[in-house]
Amino acid sequence: LLSRLAAGGVERLGIELQVGPGTFRSVECERLEDHRMDFEGIRVRARDVERLHAQDRHRAGGGGRTLAVGSTSVRTLESLPPSLEEAIAAGSDLEFATDLMLVPGMPVRRCDLLLTNFHLPRSTLIALVAAFVGLDRIKSLYAMAAREGYRFFSYGDAMLVLPEAIIAPR
């Protein structure tokens, strides 16, 4: 799939999230906001920090879209500092830890499209996807997937998640 995307002109950037067991731990709290994530390490090579900064500027000017491949890619991108200029000036890889838990209602700033699995209920990953498209929409998508016999979790089927603005532009 990544080869086909590249053949279609999609540029690939390397980002790394050292995913820990907390990503897969069930949410047991009544309120998603009360769930605590474990810290996970992030690393972005200096050259990719520059490319991400260029993509941020391009998107701000109305051009291009960012496709995150995998839910944890969204967590990684959304954990980055809003401005990457300081990291670029340092000229070194960007390395830090994050405990970001994306939940419905939180803005997703750096991703426009998401290619991901169908995640298990009460997981941090389904909460992340719901932050991307909204709780009502994710419930509808998952109900359709269950009706159609889609496979869930890491080795199951995948979906391309498009924000409402792309499906029904205003």
At which residue positions do the language-model features occur?
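Surface-exposed, charge/polar-rich loops and edge strands
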Residues: 1-170
